[in-house]
Amino acid sequence: MADDRSSNMANDSSSNTANDNPSVTTTLYEPDPESYVQFQREIYGSLRKPKYSTKPSEWEAAARNAIPLANFLYVFGAASSESTHAANRSAFERYRLRPSMLVQATRRNMSTELFGKQYKSPLLIAPIGVQEIVHQDAEEATARAAKALKVPMILSTAATRSIEQVAKANGDGDRWFQLYWPKPQAEEFTASLLSRAKANGFSVLVVTLDTFQIGWRPNDLDESYLPFIWGQGCQVGFSDPVFQRMYEKQQSEDTRTVTEKLQEVWQILKRPGSLSGAAKVLSHASIIPKAMFFTGLVASGNYRDWNDLQTLRRLWSGPIVLKVRYNCMSCGYSSQIPGDTNRGRRPQGH
């Protein structure tokens, strides 16, 4: 009898709680309609195969077949013997997920706070340059996807779209700006880039510290392929008023005669060793010198030191992230300016 009464009272109490607080069940036990798992349900619900495989292991082969080999190798390759890249992959694969059972995970919270701001995703889209060589929509497509998924996007200085174009495509999404730091003699150019980024809603500055010159990348060298020469990956610079002014000044100071300039053009036309190569050079005749000028500013071989970070602090009022692999000696210097670090060993190997 006592057990029955206790059972009835428990049932009544549970019933009253549910009736009195109907929102409790909804809030705690109904799956999030915006959860990423919805993509899985959409695939099954479509009753047809997805356009692309859901297996990341198959994407590499698919990309190799879809785009020119030189373009693929530029994205795929790493520096030197690529041993550091392989070691990083191996280390990452040793991480394991350790799920907990019988815990309330219907409404999972994967949000994280960075620099005082809450983000829905603990992941960010890394700064990947020259995206136009793999898809015609380039960084604008990435910006739209980042907004739709509510994942922060980091725009590369080596983008094939301008700062303003990417900001427009990203709308009210979260976006950071990665800086390939121009040489000290072009500080006005650096200031202009950061001013444009700030004005277009980029909230965090990510400074790459190990690419003051183009890395030794055997795949690209064997193909003699550098997209920047053809103007791809230079759009952030080409769209900058200070850069344009600097380039025009450089051109106006060129005192060579017309004959000397034509001789240079002729020598360049002969370099590819084929008519098709010469035709490509000729079609890019106005772009190549401008592209080389941009590359000379952002990959000049002029290295910075820790004291130069104070310059960035003056030019940028928001958070600054240092993107590099530290050694122990560097840690003492870096403690003076807050930052985080990570690098995928594309430009350097060890």
What residue spans do the PLM features occupy?
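An N-cap/entry alpha-helix motif that binds or orients negatively charged groups
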Residues: 19-116, 224, 228-230, 241-285, ...
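Short, conserved beta-strand segments within well-ordered enzyme catalytic domains
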Residues: 96, 111-113, 122-126, 152-154, ...
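Short beta->alpha linker loops
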Residues: 79-80, 157-161, 325-326
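A gly/proline- and charged-residue-enriched helix-loop-helix capping module
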Residues: 148-190
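Alpha/beta enzyme core
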Residues: 130, 144, 169, 183-350
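Generic secondary-structure signature for well-ordered alpha-helical cores
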Residues: 80, 90-97, 151, 198-203, ...
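Asp/Glu-rich intrinsically disordered low-complexity tracts
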Residues: 3-4, 8-12, 16-20, 24
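Glycine-rich active-site/cofactor-binding loop and its immediate structural neighborhood
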Residues: 119-158
